[in-house]
Amino acid sequence: MLKMGVVLFIFLVLFPLATLQLDADQPVERYAKNKQLFNPHKRRGIILRAPGKRCCHWNWCDHLCSCCGS
């Protein structure tokens, strides 16, 4: 009877606990949530730097940069 109790305990308690997905096992979702908290102006700066364009004052806008708006 003791062996059957141990087997039941393993399959009914320990096995389901080992197969649960914890929040810490999902780093992609946490990273996406953290990225949404960026200031919109910071995101714009990151996006502008990606293609290599600069952000210029609205008086100095030309084909080498894009206007910042302020």
Curated annotation (Swiss-Prot):
Propeptide part(s) removed at maturation, as residue ranges: 25-54
Keyword line: Cleavage on pair of basic residues, Disulfide bond, Secreted, Signal, Toxin
Cysteines joined through disulfide linkages: C55-C67, C56-C68, C61-C65
Gene Ontology cellular component annotations, sorted alphabetically: extracellular region
GO molecular function annotations of the record: ion channel inhibitor activity; toxin activity
Locations listed in the record: Secreted
Coiled-coil ranges per UniProt: none
Functional description taken from the UniProt entry: In vitro, inhibits proliferation of the mice ovarian cancer cells ID8.
The family this protein is said to belong to: Belongs to the conotoxin M superfamily.
Domain-related comment: The cysteine framework is III (CC-C-C-CC). Classified in the M-1 branch, since 1 residue stands between the fourth and the fifth cysteine residues.
Further remarks about this protein from its record: Shows a very weak inhibition on Nav1.4 and Nav1.8 sodium channels.
Name the record gives this protein: Conotoxin Mr3.8
Organism: Conus marmoreus (Marble cone)
